[in-house]
A protein has these predicted regions:
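The feature captures the beta-strand-to-loop junction immediately N-terminal to the Walker
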Residues: 36-38
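Conserved ABC transporter NBD signature motif
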Residues: 59-67
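Conserved coupling/switch loops of ABC nucleotide-binding domains, chiefly the family-specific signature
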Residues: 57-60, 210
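Non-catalytic connector elements of ABC transporters
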Residues: 249-338
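Helix-to-loop junction immediately C-terminal to a conserved catalytic motif
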Residues: 51
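ABC ATPase nucleotide-binding domains
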Residues: 75-79, 83-230
């Protein structure tokens, strides 16, 4: 287990591309951090700098109080799981799991015992003599994870380890990783482009875009109190609806539509009176029930553009002038009759 601090970390390539800008993050001992963002945002580059696979252009990487910028990857005592498993296909599962221990010149019997004990956590005991080519994708990923755990490193680094798995297996492996991390209490940094993985796995999430940190916080903090439009639009499925409107005293004007502002928000919006603002509405906060209408006395009558039936709920696309907004409605509403 280890604490990790990244101070003003930058990555600038020889061609001038600035991949990571002034990255600052303090990671507690045993914390599960997930870095998430669109492709090319700098999350994997940051992970590789922590691992020592990429040089740091400027800034300080502090591991347990020691500056490790120039320390070789093998001396950092961190273990990395890659998206493509990175297994040796000419070696058995047993030898793949134990390769890092063998490199450390540990004794043969202790190595075998460690492999056996760790493989039990991943249900791999019956596959130790097989070659990776004879395993399913999920089993190969478990071998890669097992190989990481058997090292007992100070930090786990995981670069999109579930992206090659199907949806059902991804969900199962996701919960296994979380359970294992809580059991081992090993500091973990996990990179993904999948916000569901981020929301369900992380103690804290780091959202990145274009090489910058956009916000750091718990899943609840990011969902309920996004710092900016990027975070608000990135977190949540379906995406948050953004509607341009004008503040007019105690009301919001969306072209010819008028929505009363809740008393609790009137003071907050007072400085914006007469100005254009962006109203953000989560799809699940749009409702069709009379009870909600009677409670708030605010409603819009909007035509349905189309809808998607998902069993327990509908994603309903509503037309608001030139915009399409999404409502997430319980399937007890028969929108096909609306």
């Amino acid at each position: 287990m280890a604490s990790l601090k990244l101070v003003n970390i930058n990555k600038i390539y020889p061609n001038g591309a600035h991949a990571v800008h002034d990255f600052n993050l303090d990671i507690k001992d045993g914390e599960f951090i997930v870095m998430v963002g669109p492709s090319g945002c700098g999350k994997s580059t940051t992970l590789r700098m922590i691992a020592g696979l990429e040089s740091i252009s400027s800034g300080d990487l502090i591991l347990d109080g020691e500056r490790v910028n120039k320390l070789a990857p093998v001396d950092r005592d961190v273990a990395m799981v890659f998206q493509n498993y990175a297994l040796y296909y000419n070696m058995s599962v047993h030898d793949n799991i134990g390769i890092s221990l063998k490199i450390k010149h540990e004794q043969k019997n202790p190595i075998h015992n460690s492999i056996l004990e760790t493989s039990k956590k991943f249900d791999l005991v019956d596959y130790l003599n097989r070659l990776p080519a004879n395993l399913s994708g999920g089993q190969r990923q478990r071998v890669a994870l097992c190989r990481t755990v058997v090292r007992n490193p100070r930090v786990f680094l995981m670069d999109e380890p579930l992206s090659n798995l199907d949806a059902k297996l991804r969900e199962k492996t996701r919960s296994e990783i979380v359970s294992l991390q809580r059991e081992l209490k090993t500091t973990t940094i996990y990179v993904t482009h999948d916000q569901i993985e981020a929301m369900t796995m992380a103690d804290r999430i780091v959202i990145m875009n274009n090489g910058y940190i956009m916000q750091v916080g718990t899943p609840t903090e990011l969902y309920d109190k996004p710092d900016n439009l990027f975070v608000a639009g990135f977190i949540g499925t379906p995406n948050m609806n953004f509607i341009k409107c004008i503040v007019d005293g105690t009301s919001l004007h969306i072209k010819d539509e008028i929505i009363p502002i809740a008393v609790s928000h009137q003071e907050i919006l007072k400085p914006y009176d007469g100005k254009e603002v962006i109203l953000g509405i989560r799809p699940e906060h749009i409702d069709m029930s009379e009870e909600i209408y009677n409670l708030h006395k605010a409603a819009l009558t909007l035509p349905i553009d189309y809808y998607e039936y998902l069993g327990k709920e509908y994603y309903v696309k509503l037309r608001l002038y030139d915009d399409i907004i999404t409502a997430r409605l319980d399937s007890r509403y028969d929108v096909s009759k609306e």
